[in-house]
Amino acid sequence: MVRPKHQPGGLCLLLLLLCQFMEDRSAQAGNCWLRQAKNGRCQVLYKTELSKEECCSTGRLSTSWTEEDVNDNTLFKWMIFNGGAPNCIPCKETCENVDCGPGKKCRMNKKNKPRCVCAPDCSNITWKGPVCGLDGKTYRNECALLKARCKEQPELEVQYQGKCKKTCRDVFCPGSSTCVVDQTNNAYCVTCNRICPEPTSSEQYLCGNDGVTYSSACHLRKATCLLGRSIGLAYEGKCIKAKSCEDIQCTGGKKCLWDFKVGRGRCSLCDELCPESKSEEPVCASDNATYASECAMKEAACSSGVLLEVKHSGSCNSISEDTEEEEEDEDQDYSFPISSILEW
């Protein structure tokens, strides 16, 4: 029996093909990055050992690729000390087949590079006047608000048409929402929660600034919403017939301030440091004194232990008596934040 002779040529050919494959794979493999910085370098590593085709298949405009397949130490030095990876190749050179998502369009910038910019569809907007946003700011129109939402505030919505107001007068809230004036005298449209669970503990009772005991924070918020302006929290627990602040126990580092107008005390935060800013607007307080800012007024109240409220902005001599009467009923609260009013 004659055995076939071993042919080394076949094994060499196999090894040659394997080496060629490894070389091709090594040449194609690189690093995929999520963005190219202004300095031209790749930043935010997405994945290693990817070909350019694999990296750029994500369709993201900012995705970039580097050909060099380097070790982890080099990658670390690039990202920490060098501002990114060199020889950065952007996946997209034009706006062709670029999907920027809703409210955005791809446009070539001055450097002839594709960029996604905010371009909301405003064709169906019927109201052309100013609108008040959920952030309490007035926008010249709804389209301007949509651009602001696209850029930095994804939760921003129109709460009512017209400029943001300090009173619920002439505010028309959409749907079933109700206008509420918060403790900073800003009007907001909120939806009143008309169903509150019954309290399960006596620790849930709260005393409002109106001298009424509420079963829980939910009941206080509900009353605030239905009333249309801030009630505010005086202190935790049921309301008591206190003769002075000595009868009231404040928690959470708060201090009791006595309201001589109604003969009640309320717990207020007194650890606020007033900034040295010349841009602060002076306020006229309930003691008919003018303070450099609302913060300065609160500081004086905490120092004296007597509650002070803002009657109006500006000097006490800079506004008519009619306007004072209109704003006299607005209740000021130091310790009941706006988020507590609006979270239903």
From Swiss-Prot:
Protein name: Follistatin
Region (Disordered): 314-344
Keyword Nucleus: yes
Annotated Follistatin-like domain residues: 94-117, 167-190, 244-268
Glycosylation site list: 124, 288
Gene Ontology MF terms in the entry: activin binding
Keywords, comma-separated and alphabetical: Disulfide bond, Glycoprotein, Nucleus, Repeat, Secreted, Signal
Disulfide bonds: 32-55, 42-88, 56-91, 95-106, 100-116, 118-150, 122-143, 132-164, 168-179, 173-189, 192-225, 196-218, 207-239, 245-256, 250-267, 270-302, 274-295, 284-316
Cellular localisation: Secreted; Nucleus, Nucleolus
Species classification: Eukaryota, Metazoa, Chordata, Craniata, Vertebrata
Residues making up the signal peptide according to the UniProt record: 1-29
Native species: Sus scrofa (Pig)
Gene3D superfamilies for this protein: 3.30.60.30, TGF-beta binding (TB) domain (3.90.290.10)
TB domain sequence ranges: 30-103
Name of encoding gene: FST
Post-translational modification: N-glycosylated.
Composition bias type Acidic residues, residue spans: 321-333
